[in-house]
Amino acid sequence: MSLSETATQAPQPANVLLEVNDLRVTFATPDGDVTAVNDLNFTLRAGETLGIVGESGSGKSQTAFALMGLLATNGRIGGSATFNGREILNLPERELNTLRAEQISMIFQDPMTSLNPYMRVGEQLMEVLMLHKGMSKAEAFEESVRMLDAVKMPEARKRMKMYPHEFSGGMRQRVMIAMALLCRPKLLIADELTTALDVTVQAQIMTLLNELKREFNTAIIMITHDLGVVAGICDKVLVMYAGRTMEYGKARDVFYQPVHPYSIGLLNAVPRLDSEGAEMLTIPGNPPNLLRLPKGCPFQPRCPHAMEICNNAPPLEAFSPGRLRACFKPVEELL
């Protein structure tokens, strides 16, 4: 089965699969409204991978939850998100369930809490196919085995009869990837996919995702704080801070020529294996309280390049084709 078999609408021009415009997520709290995502914009084409990076509380996961219709009950959403030319924000529940089943899938951070501990893994995989694809039990079993084989699960047929607690963390994550891909989605959202895994298993999972992306032409949104993960798989990078876009561009550009002080700080904080004894760098201070954001640029209190003009909010502007940033500091002074 190919991805084209699940398409229900014609793609947008230039093969744009997902287009997000002015996405805004606000939560009502006893202390006031909290804006977790503030006017986010990006596009994603079939087969592309977008990395959304930033510290905890930057709005990465809430962006994904908004697209999936999984916000908490006190959340409100604004803006627009079109998938295959169709607006998907605030869809009726039935249409949203169909979309999530057949076209968009999400892998959550902790596979142990995402899998039902009382059901065999095979039953959980088969349930997806029987419910959403109308397969018989026998057909669903064989297709589930094929997908476990596709994600390099050893002894896949035997593993179908096992419970989640009998798997290692890396194997459980492979099960979640297999489950997410069963319906051949056009878009896969991975939220902190490798956080709980050791470095060796992380590398295996990243290699696997790259292979599956090529095989199924699936677009991926990779939500992570691990810049190594982004470097290994992503085509484009969106750097978020306090719910806003700080920088956006091709991954190689953001990594080799970052043009926002926050992006530079994140990259400088990555430990280097080629500099033995080098000082470990950090970004001073803490992420802001979203109820009491600083005036102007939210990164200003922590920024080594802060100027008086930073008391005003910098607009997100293009400074070269395909690259955006929100900063008053001249680009040439940061390179």
What are these regions (language model features)?
Residues 74, 88-105, 123, 131, ...:
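ABC ATPase NBD coupling module
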Residues 13-17, 26-39, 70-76, 92-95, ...:
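A short, flexible loop at the N-terminus of ABC-type nucleotide-binding domains that lies
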Residues 87, 139-158, 267:
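Conserved ABC ATPase "signature" region
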Residues 182-186:
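A short, proline-enriched helix->beta-strand linker immediately N-terminal to the Walker B motif
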Residues 76-87:
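Conserved ABC transporter NBD signature motif
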Residues 13-16, 154-158, 248-335:
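Short catalytic/signature loops enriched in Gly
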Residues 69-70, 189-193, 197-278:
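P-loop NTP-binding/switch modules centered on Walker-like glycine-rich loops
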